[in-house]
Amino acid sequence: MATSRTAPTRAPSLRSSPALEASPSRTKASVGALVILAVVALCVYLMDQITKALVVSNLSEGQQVAVLGQLLQLHFVKNPGAAFSIGSGSTWIFSLVGVGVLGFVIWYAPRIRSTAWAILFGLLLGGLLGNLTDRLFREPGFGVGHVIDFLQIPLLTAIFNLADVAIVFSMGLFLLLTLRGIGLDGRRQRDEGAGVSSASPAGDESAADKPENLSA
């Protein structure tokens, strides 16, 4: 019996895969996400610092002012601790932690291509910068400055500021995106898994179609 020979089938090269190459659209999406992140962070930071300046200028420390009756009050305090007055005796530790987290956010930001993740990191960055500015430049000294807190809800014992609110919202958004399986590129992880599994049968089919070599 004659031997049937077929040309060897070449495996697809990973280098030529368009999914692995940086396309202009992905680059544009990355730049757009960074712009959103920067705008959100700047807005949070400015709102936080402006409201703190207004409180310091118009209220005395410890003063309380009703804004929405018993629902929301202004209560000016100087907080040497973390968010919601946690750890008031370790201001310098929170300053170092804030610098470290801030550096991580800036280092990780270029990987973001999702609008939702950009908003998340913008809220986190703006909030961190707001409170870190207080710790670095307010009294009693550099790195141990007291954070200006002024918002109080009777249902909560803590007094906080807009930077704290932004950080809490970023954590809530993080939980939501994580539970939904949305990655930094905006894609769901299960959708990516489905794409990989749908590509596998094609490779198996090509292997099955390859004729066997028979010898006499």
From Swiss-Prot:
Pathway: Protein modification; lipoprotein biosynthesis (signal peptide cleavage). It is found in: Cell membrane. The keyword Protease applies. Keywords: Aspartyl protease, Cell membrane, Hydrolase, Membrane, Protease, Transmembrane, Transmembrane helix. The chain crosses the membrane at residues 31-51, 89-109, 114-134, 159-179. GO terms for biological process: proteolysis. Residues 1-21, 189-216 are annotated as: Disordered. The active site is at residues 149, 164. Residues 207-216 have a biased composition (Basic and acidic residues). It catalyses: Release of signal peptides from bacterial membrane prolipoproteins. Hydrolyzes -Xaa-Yaa-Zaa-|-(S,diacylglyceryl)Cys-, in which Xaa is hydrophobic (preferably Leu), and Yaa (Ala or Ser) and Zaa (Gly or Ala) have small, neutral side chains. It is a multi-pass membrane protein. Its main location: membrane. It is an enzyme of class 3 (hydrolase). One of its GO terms (molecular function) is aspartic-type endopeptidase activity. One of its GO terms (cellular component) is plasma membrane. Its EC number is 3.4.23.36. This protein specifically catalyzes the removal of signal peptides from prolipoproteins. Belongs to the peptidase A8 family. This is Lipoprotein signal peptidase. The gene is lspA.
